[in-house]
Amino acid sequence: MVTTQKAVVLLSGGLDSSTVLFRAKALGYACYALSFDYGQRHRRELEAAIAIATSAGVVEHQILPLNLRLWGGSALTDLSIDLPRDRDLATMSQEIPVTYVPARNTIFLSVALAYAEALEARSVHIGVNALDYSGYPDCRPDYIAAMQEVYRLGTKQGREGQPIEIVTPLIDLHKTDIIRLGHGYGVPWEKTWSCYSDGQQACGRCDACRLRLAAFAELGLVDPLPYAVHPPL
């Protein structure tokens, strides 16, 4: 009897994590989606995460409340910090942006590790990618390698020689590559959400919107999300 391997998939509801989930599902994993209600200004992404998890047919979808607004430190968790708007890609990659949430992936990957170990899952899947690690310190390959060592040393499974693997299938990909990949897996882009604002329409001006719109345009595709504005890219 063949046992389907369990996998925990970190799911925000955006392009990247949705592609990772549909990929894991296509590879035959029994997928357990994990999302966080962490006080993000764009709580609309949680609606997207629920829709994507349902579309993918996950075994379980956990949404963990975690109030990172208690200390802020990011434009995503502190409403007094303005979101960057109307920036080009070159400007975005010059420094760590104010949308970086302090230690967010360390927190998320730690919770995912606990969830995976409790499930006796063999892997945690996360959608970090090349565009992210140009700006975010907790999306870079050396960071993932360090967290993999934490997974090996900090768990019963790891100490017994079967560490839970951190799977990063998008690590070397750009947004255009990710959209191509997700398209092949049938990701319903209209159900995803990338915008840092919290309306029923994406703003079209934040970094996340501009990266997404530029990638769809480069591929000659129409992004099915409704946008408040369609700025020149």
Swiss-Prot record:
Binds 1 zinc ion per subunit. Pfam families: QueC. It catalyses: 7-carboxy-7-deazaguanine + NH4(+) + ATP = 7-cyano-7-deazaguanine + ADP + phosphate + H2O + H(+). The keyword Zinc applies. One of its GO terms (molecular function) is ATP binding. Zn(2+) binds at C195, C203, C206, C209. It is an enzyme of class 6 (ligase). Belongs to the QueC family. Catalyzes the ATP-dependent conversion of 7-carboxy-7-deazaguanine (CDG) to 7-cyano-7-deazaguanine (preQ(0)). HAMAP family: QueC (MF_01633). This is 7-cyano-7-deazaguanine synthase. It comes from Thermosynechococcus vestitus (strain NIES-2133 / IAM M-273 / BP-1).
